[in-house]
Amino acid sequence: MAIKPVAHKKIIKKRTKKFVRFESEDFAKLDSSWRRPRGIDNRVRRRFRGQRRMAKIGFASDAATKHLLPNGFKKFLIRNPADLEILLMNNRTYCGEIAHNISAQVKAALVKRAAELGVRLTNANAKVKVQESA
């Protein structure tokens, strides 16, 4: 039987669009990741009408639903079998995500052990190759 998360408030995002760095689309050398504009004449910093919004604390998530995934769990990174034992007591609050650098053989063992312990995994069926015998 699938593990259900603890009941929580409805997750409401105050803003779903990403905050993009000012003029990052005009210059290839500027990455699009957010940087606060600090220029004395900058129209985004001065909040002129028609300009993009600046990131500020008012856009933050509700504290009760912060870090929640859409499935209702919080994510916990699993790097070895001992990390699964940590989730045993909190399997209704946290779900595991197997780290990207885990080998397929160890990953298969982790998925099997998680099913025994009743721990939910977000990427249980990723990077699983079935070998064909010739």
UniProtKB/Swiss-Prot annotation:
This is Large ribosomal subunit protein eL32. GO terms for cellular component: cytosolic large ribosomal subunit. Belongs to the eukaryotic ribosomal protein eL32 family. GO terms for biological process: translation. It comes from Tetrahymena thermophila (strain SB210). CDD domains: Ribosomal_L32_L32e. It comes from the Eukaryota. Disulfide bonds: none annotated. One of its GO terms (molecular function) is structural constituent of ribosome. SMART domains: Ribosomal_L32e (SM01393). PANTHER family: 60S RIBOSOMAL PROTEIN L32 AND DNA-DIRECTED RNA POLYMERASE II, SUBUNIT N, RIBOSOMAL PROTEIN L32. The lineage of its organism: Eukaryota, Sar, Alveolata, Ciliophora, Intramacronucleata. Pfam families: Ribosomal_L32e. InterPro entries: Ribosomal_eL32 (IPR001515), Ribosomal_eL32_sf (IPR036351). Keywords: Ribonucleoprotein, Ribosomal protein.
